[in-house]
């Protein structure tokens, strides 16, 4: 009987040991912070565990054996933010730490609003820089943030037409589509346009549709600073929706807004049209500023007819009396809209 009792005791003890779970291990555990997990749900206090540079747990409080523990009590924890419209390419080439973005929580910088770092120069020339090579330059320099880029629609136009304000020929469109295909194969996210700046606004709707049809074949998307953001914003939105439909491509509106107080009421109609297009099956999204002001450079105020031919032609044109008179009239008219 004693032997049976002893064996039973051992068995129960082993069973209890078997039921106990080991505390999982990780390299870094973050405890006590309010977690905003990116789903849109309410934040919650919990635990995040990281192992081998991968997040292995996000959830309610849980114990981990960790090499490093971060107490985030009183702080917010969120996935890295995406800078959807970054002009940091040049700065990153000079200083890849990206401190200005990292200190604001940005971990991905996306380039390509209208123009992109490549392609530049003539294909075959020693100084030619392809889209892929431009992005590889940053990757090889080991910049701190992740980087991605759209192919600038204006960059494609400059490659084949320059700064002329005219419609692309059929031959030029074919060449432009080849450029898009090459860039998409090199990792472009799609086509980015900025249609209030020269030479981007020299492109008509047909040209933009042609470029986006190629991007669509590679699973790309179209993102656009629309052609107008004031009293003609609805026409500009119609153009974006048409491009999305004809090219069968998802489209996003850069920094959706209506500029100048007389046009603020139009934003309700813009949003309603976007929702209607989405209900129809078009894949339309938008991003917005988190503040109530916008800014731009001189190129956003100077009419694009002045800028035709590039900077040197622009400067020379502004030195002439008649163009200067017309310029002042057009600027005043634009700012009054």
Tell where the protein language model's regions lie, with residue ranges.
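Histidine-rich, glycine-flanked metal-binding segment
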Residues: 22-28, 35, 39-80
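C-terminal motif of bacterial Sec signal peptides marking the signal peptidase cleavage site
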Residues: 15-18
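Short acidic, glycine-rich surface-loop motifs adjacent to enzyme active sites
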Residues: 186-195, 253-255
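Bacterial N-terminal signal peptides that target proteins for export
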Residues: 1-7
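Alpha-helix-loop-beta-strand connector modules within alpha/beta enzyme cores
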Residues: 142, 205-224, 247
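Histidine-centered catalytic micro-motifs
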Residues: 81-91, 195, 222-228
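Divalent-metal coordination cores built from histidine and acidic residues
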Residues: 72-77, 81-86, 92-190, 212, ...
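Polyanionic/metal-chelating signatures
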Residues: 120-127, 131-138, 143, 154-166, ...
């Amino acid at each position: 009987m004693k032997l049976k009792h002893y064996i039973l005791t051992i068995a129960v003890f082993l069973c209890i040991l078997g039921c106990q779970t080991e505390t999982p291990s990780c390299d870094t555990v973050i405890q006590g912070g309010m977690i905003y997990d990116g789903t849109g749900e309410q934040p919650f206090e919990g635990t995040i565990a990281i192992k081998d540079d991968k997040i292995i747990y996000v959830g309610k409080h849980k114990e981990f054996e960790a090499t490093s523990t971060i107490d985030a009590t009183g702080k917010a924890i969120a996935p890295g933010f995406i800078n959807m419209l970054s002009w940091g390419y040049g700065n990153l080439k000079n200083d890849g730490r990206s401190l200005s973005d990292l200190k604001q929580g940005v971990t991905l910088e996306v380039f390509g609003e209208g123009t992109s770092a490549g392609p530049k120069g003539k294909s075959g020339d020693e100084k030619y820089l392809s889209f892929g090579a431009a992005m590889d330059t940053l990757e090889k320099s080991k910049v701190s943030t992740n980087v991605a880029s759209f192919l600038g629609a204006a960059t494609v136009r400059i490659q084949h037409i320059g700064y002329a304000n005219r419609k692309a020929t059929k031959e030029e469109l074919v060449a432009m589509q080849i450029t898009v295909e090459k860039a998409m194969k090199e990792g472009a996210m799609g086509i980015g346009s900025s249609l209030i700046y020269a030479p981007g606004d020299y492109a008509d709707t047909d040209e933009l549709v042609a470029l986006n049809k190629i991007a669509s074949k590679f699973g790309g998307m179209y993102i656009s600073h629309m052609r107008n953001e004031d009293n003609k914003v609805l026409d500009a939105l119609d153009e974006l929706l048409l491009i999305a439909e004809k090219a069968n491509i998802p489209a996003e509106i850069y920094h959706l807004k209506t500029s100048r107080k007389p046009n603020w009421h139009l934003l309700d109609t813009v949003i309603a049209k976007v929702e209607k297009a989405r209900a129809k099956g078009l894949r339309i999204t938008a991003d917005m500023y988190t503040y109530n002001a916008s800014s731009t450079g001189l190129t956003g105020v100077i009419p694009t007819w002045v800028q035709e031919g590039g900077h040197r032609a622009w400067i020379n044109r502004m030195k002439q009396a008649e163009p200067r008179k017309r310029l002042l009239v057009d600027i005043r008219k634009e700012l009054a809209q």
